[in-house]
A protein has these predicted regions:
Chain A
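An extracytoplasmic/periplasmic, membrane-proximal ligand-sensing/linker region
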Residues: 201-203, 311-356
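Early extracytoplasmic/lumenal segment of secretory-pathway proteins
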Residues: 22-23, 37, 42-110, 356
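A ligand-binding cleft/hinge motif common to bilobed small-molecule-binding domains
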Residues: 107-111, 235-258
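Periplasmic-binding protein-like
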Residues: 146, 177-182, 207-211, 217-218, 255-282, 295-318
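A bilobed periplasmic-binding-protein/Venus flytrap-type ligand-binding module shared by bacterial periplasmic
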Residues: 149-156, 195, 273-287, 295, ...
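C-terminal motif of bacterial Sec signal peptides marking the signal peptidase cleavage site
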Residues: 16-20
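Extracytoplasmic ligand-binding site segments that recognize negatively charged/polar headgroups
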Residues: 54-61, 80-84, 96-233, 269
Length: 356, 528
């Protein structure tokens, strides 16, 4: 009720001040050492928080239910695409009913953060996660890691045929055989990484060569993995965990599928590890949203992701998903996720190559 | 009232102008004057033209066959022909791709591109033409045709020169709706990989969260819509025709001779391809996957969410459409034409743009309504107003104004004339419009995701959620229920509008007792 009244008041006043809507207010200075409960207004928990989730309900609802039974804090959840959710948050601005934003990739968190809509996270939270997997300004943290891989059909591709680098996929031996999802954020982040690591020209060349090599274009990673499993495509560039979702849907063990994962070696761009992550939206009236971040980064929360979504944990001391190489053993490219912000150039390059 | 309705329709447009004006004309022009935009324009327009022409052929042809000929099986077919409208384009396209994959071993021969998009969009859009034309044909007074026939005109010339001109407003309105639907569609073109404006708008939004690019592209879509509206307006210039009787009686079905079986065959082919392919795919998904059981726990909530939001949306839309439609039909003139046309402008905008504009409207102007079912219903009204306006206007155009004049001359107040004469005469059209809005709202996705109350599910959002991670078995029950629920209002409307003789399961009985089954639209058919 309090919230409704407050919102109504803002609603009545807002048209008057709309024109004055400039840059958002700076968030309160980050508490150095103070816990979330004492930060900001220091208000008591009201036992409820609103979460905007850009991750799929089937994947995250169970862990959110665990959080509620653990803490007694109810979570009101909106589900939509990460991109649509980011657009909605940007449109809502300071009037957003959201307390927290759970996103599928770093780019969306970066876009919302760039508009000043995310709060600074306390240092203890940031300390839990490697610097590579959090925002440079401390406004969001990674919750899970996902690696780019080449999913390949074990009947159609022999192990010695597997490429050492994504660069090889533009060669004649892969003509018509490689599935890609150019509209997908994970593909775009990977291309951005290629631009950062190897330069604009190299990335443009790779895209043009790929486009000329008759790639199999799909809308989603999941479609690529399913088509690789069925043999419609020989191989495809995807995130690693889609294979486990396919196995769950078909009700079989992952090894029984005709699709397997190839992790690119030697720090190749094709082995980029991206994150799903979370940021706190707007003024935090209480510590409820922070409690959710704490829970998702706790051993229980992280174990859920490892076991149920086959993603890599962000905190130390936890094993990665069974059957996969450990995160620290992956030969990932040397790149900071914060450097992947410039998506516009990437998109125009992908468009130019004729893949979008 | 009509102005209020227009304001609702223009909300998204105002938002677009506000947002693009922030960037300035120079940057707008820089974004728009590119080769890509030219290509998108060409693709979008060609697709709209091809699909609209195909929809007119299938829609008018099938409407005529089920209402005016002795084609066997036309009563069940009349209902089935409306059903493809209940299949969301994203479900349709996906099931077509997955069925075509069964046959095609060659991945490069994948079912995608212009032809695929045109085929799928036609099969699931033609009911926009079929429904209003069939309703109009069922109500048109057959006496003029009988006169024409008795004066020696052949059946085909009578059809072309007498019958079709009488239902021209319904044909033009239906064609316009189909064209605008194609411009706004995202589901089919994205799955079938055809780069249209809507897909480019979604891509700009979803990759890079580039709202200004997306909205700039949307303004071009508005310009295209204006062009289409202008073109359609020119075809209408000959003016509306009014039938002369107050209550029509069914026309005597034309005996097609042996050709009647060809007619049935053609209708069956349309129904089977449009409904059979999704049915086949959904059955396969149910059988193949392991996640189907998860749908049953939540399907009730989702169905309730769909029904309540769509019903509220349909009621609101019809309430807003009534004054616009009546004004356009009764007082044709520059102002009423302008108001009516304005209603169409938001219809060609993709749901996500309308959704975003109402997010903006919600948080800045109507915060207490934000993320309530009311704002969602308003979004449906904004998106689907033309569906109801077209239905009301074409029904009103056929109801003779002479009856209203007579009532007025006998001393009835305007309000009484409205409730006792105008409303009953236009009710079948209103019913058809309400059902169209109801059906379309049930399958709407992007705006629903943005605007629904937090925690509320609809069948479409659950379907989206399940397919998002490849749980097709779980998606299948939602898709099936969505189509099944949408089938109920379709059936009721088909009966009420007189496409199928009311109260009679046997289609031939209308020949023996032509007047006994005359529809008497005296009770409200707002929405089932």
């Amino acid at each position: 009720m309090i919230r409704v009244t407050r919102l109504a008041l803002v609603g009545a006043l807002l048209p008057l001040t709309l024109a004055a809507c400039g840059p958002t207010e700076e968030p309160a200075p980050a508490s150095d050492g103070g816990t979330a409960d004492t930060a900001e207004s220091g208000a008591e928990s009201d036992g409820t928080l609103t979460l905007y989730s850009g991750r799929n309900e089937e994947l995250v609802q169970p862990v959110l239910d665990d959080f509620t039974s653990e803490t007694g804090i109810e979570v009101e959840i909106r589900y939509a695409d990460t991109a649509a959710m980011a657009a909605q948050l940007l449109e809502e601005g300071e009037n957003s009913p959201a307390d927290a934003f759970l996103a599928q990739d770093a780019g969306a968190l970066g876009a919302v953060s760039a508009e000043g809509l995310l709060q600074d996270l306390p240092q203890e939270t940031l300390d839990l996660v490697p610097d590579t997997y959090e925002s440079a300004d401390g406004t969001w943290v990674g919750l899970t890691g996902r690696s780019r891989v080449l999913a390949y059909n074990t009947q159609a591709v022999s192990e010695d045929e597997l490429p050492a680098s994504v660069q090889e996929l533009t060669g004649p031996e892969w003509t018509g055989r490689v599935g890609v999802a150019p509209t997908n954020a994970s593909f775009q982040s990977f291309v951005t990484a290629m631009r950062v690591l190897e330069g604009e020209d190299a990335a443009a060349t790779w895209l043009a060569d790929l486009a000329a090599n008759d790639p199999q274009i799909r809308e989603k990673n999941g479609e690529i993995v399913a088509d690789v499993d069925s043999g419609a495509i020989d191989a495809g560039l995807v995130n690693h965990y889609y294979l486990y979702e396919l196995a769950a849907e078909k009700g079989v063990a992952p090894e029984e599928l005709d699709v397997a994962l190839h992790f690119f070696p030697g720090g190749d761009t094709g082995a980029l590890v991206n994150i799903s992550g979370m940021g706190l939206v707007g003024e935090q009236a209480d510590g409820d949203a922070q409690a959710l971040v704490d829970y998702l980064l706790s051993e229980a929360g992280q174990t859920y992701f490892v076991e149920q979504t086959s993603e890599y944990p962000m905190i130390e001391g936890l094993e990665g998903p069974a059957g996969l190489p450990a995160l620290k053993d992956l030969e990932t490219p040397d790149i900071d996720l914060n450097d992947l912000e410039d998506l516009q150039t990437t998109i125009s390059m992908i468009t130019e190559a004729g893949l979008l | 009232m009509a102005l209020a309705a227009t304001a609702v329709a223009l909300l998204p447009l105002g938002y677009l102008l506000l947002r693009t004006a922030e960037g300035g004309l120079a940057s707008w022009w820089e974004t728009v004057a590119t080769e890509r935009v030219a290509r998108l324009t060409a693709t979008s327009l060609s697709l709209a033209v091809v699909v609209t022409v195909a929809c007119l052929v299938i829609g008018v042809g099938s409407a005529w066959l089920v209402t005016r000929s002795n084609t066997p099986g036309r009563a069940p077919l009349a209902v089935l022909l409306a059903l493809p409208l209940a299949v969301p384009s994203y479900v349709a396209a996906f099931t077509w791709v997955s069925v075509s994959d069964l046959w095609s071993g060659d991945p490069s021969a994948r079912f995608e591109g212009f032809g695929a998009a045109a085929l799928v969009l036609t099969l699931y859009t033609y009911p926009y033409v079929y429904l209003p034309v069939a309703a109009a044909l069922a109500r048109v007074d057959p006496s003029q045709e009988e006169v024409a026939r008795s004066l020696g005109r052949g059946p085909w010339r009578t059809l072309l020169t007498v019958t079709l001109p009488q239902v021209r407003p319904a044909i033009a309105g239906g064609g316009l709706l189909a064209a605008l639907y194609v411009l706004a569609d995202f589901g089919a073109v994205s799955i079938l990989r055809l780069d249209t404006f809507t897909r480019a708008i979604f891509t700009a939004l979803s990759s890079g969260f580039n709202r200004s690019m997306a909205l700039t592209l949307a303004t071009v879509l508005v310009l295209l819509t204006l062009g289409i509206l202008w073109g359609e307006g020119r075809t209408r210039r000959a003016g509306a025709r009014f039938s002369t009787a107050s209550v029509s009686r069914p026309a005597t079905p034309l005996d097609l001779g042996p050709w009647r079986f060809v007619g049935t065959g053609a209708l069956v082919v349309v129904v089977l391809t449009a409904l059979g392919v999704p049915a086949l795919s959904l059955a396969r998904w149910m059988a193949a996957g392991s996640s189907a059981g998860q749908a049953w726990d939540r399907i009730g909530d989702a169905a309730w969410g769909s029904l309540s939001a769509s019903l509220l949306g349909a009621l609101l839309t019809v309430a807003l459409a009534l004054p616009v439609g009546l004004l356009a039909a009764r007082h044709p003139g520059r102002l009423s034409a302008l108001l009516e046309r304005a209603a169409y402008l938001a219809h060609a905008l993709p749901g996500v743009v309308v959704g975003l504009s109402l997010v903006f409207f919600g948080v800045t102007v109507a915060l207490p309504l934000y993320q309530t079912t009311w704002l969602l219903a308003l979004a449906y009204a904004s998106l689907f107003l033309p569906l109801a306006v077209a239905a009301v206007a074409s029904a009103a155009a056929q109801a003779p104004p002479s009856l209203e004049e007579a009532a007025q001359s006998l001393g009835s107040s305007p309000a009484r004339v409205f409730t006792r004469v105008t409303l009953p005469l236009t009710l079948p059209g209103i019913g058809a419009g309400a059902a169209l809005v109801f059906l379309t709202a049930m399958k709407e996705l992007p705006a629903t995701l943005l605007l629904r109350p937090t925690g509320m599910d609809t069948l479409a959002t659950r379907l989206w959620s399940a397919t998002g991670i490849g749980r097709y078995a779980e998606a299948a029950p939602y898709a099936l229920l969505l189509v099944a629920l949408a089938a109920v209002p379709t059936w009721v409307v088909v009966r009420r509008t007189g496409i199928v003789p009311a109260g009679s399961g046997a289609p031939r009985s209308d020949r023996s007792v032509p007047t006994a089954t005359a529809p008497a639209p005296a009770e409200p058919v707002v929405s089932p």
